[in-house]
Amino acid sequence: MTPNKIQINRAPVLTLWAAVVAVRLGFDHDEALSLGKALAGLNAQSTGRRLGIFKPAPKEIRKVRERERGEEFWVDLLGRALPAVNADQGVRAVVGSKPIEPAGVERYLESKFGDALPEARKAMKELASAFEPDELAERGFGLYEQFRPQIPEGVVGWGAKGDLDLDAIKKLAVQK
């Protein structure tokens, strides 16, 4: 690992990027953390299903879970619709009927990025700031695909770490 490269798997990278994009689109920091974690979770779940690691839940169970969520709405972030609720503290993405708390997401990011979290966050903020919100909303996932860690395809790559190159993220902002 060099100072500008971080060995990390894709889930925390997507979590952080989605949170940074959500802030740029107008959500506050805590709301963005909750939404970012939900997006990465849904992405991992769909990838896991495609690889045969997770099996989809029966339709009846999904319908019950949706009814039990109460007053929810959907937030579109990086091309995915995320279930959310308006809690006392602000917007929170939900998993099942449970809101995702931002403090837990911040601890997760700190544990995965370690001391490199501030620099990774800074690079991603610079990239997000290079775009107007509407353009970022449209291109955000494609940008992530350009800088995400490269890992082996298929089941062998599940959970594998790759290099997150902070210089590559910064170059995308300049090339914009």
What are these model-derived regions, one by one?
Residues 1-176:
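Solvent-exposed interaction surfaces and binding hotspots enriched for charged
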